[in-house]
């Protein structure tokens, strides 16, 4: 399963890697909404270990944004993300399809997303991601009709969600995959 992590979440992962990846159980922040999403990222990492493996892409456009002004800690985590993506053999396929990404990006104009958000979502769609995880409330609101702001919505095959919103679905998917393998 391909999970596209928006730039803001990639930065949180880098800044709080010890908490998210299980090395440190002490909550790194006091702000309740951010803490909920960091705990959800921590749970997603634990769920990944139960599944058949997930891919988190590191396309050029995302990496360019992440590497604008990273801290040393962020730079280290981003280099790991890029190495894993390249090792999975996904980088070549991603780089070759700029025309498709541009077409998808144009189809997203009616959503009135910020340029960077539209580009990232178009990349996620072009790569065949199942999830586009973000903590950007504006992005989430622009991809959900007003009556459905509290529901998961699919944008051209990709669910745009906060980490905390995707856990029930990912858990259910793992359960169904495990149940079918018996």
Where are these regions (language model features)?
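A generic local structural motif
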Residues: 42, 118-120, 146
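A short helix-to-beta-strand connector/capping loop
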Residues: 52, 86-89, 153-158
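Acidic, PIN/NYN-like endoribonuclease modules and their adjacent C-terminal/linker elements
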Residues: 2-4, 17-18, 22-29, 110, ...
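Active-site neighborhoods of divalent-metal-dependent phosphate/nucleic-acid chemistry enzymes
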Residues: 88-133, 137-141, 178, 182
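PIN/NYN-family metal-dependent endoribonuclease catalytic core
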Residues: 5, 10-73
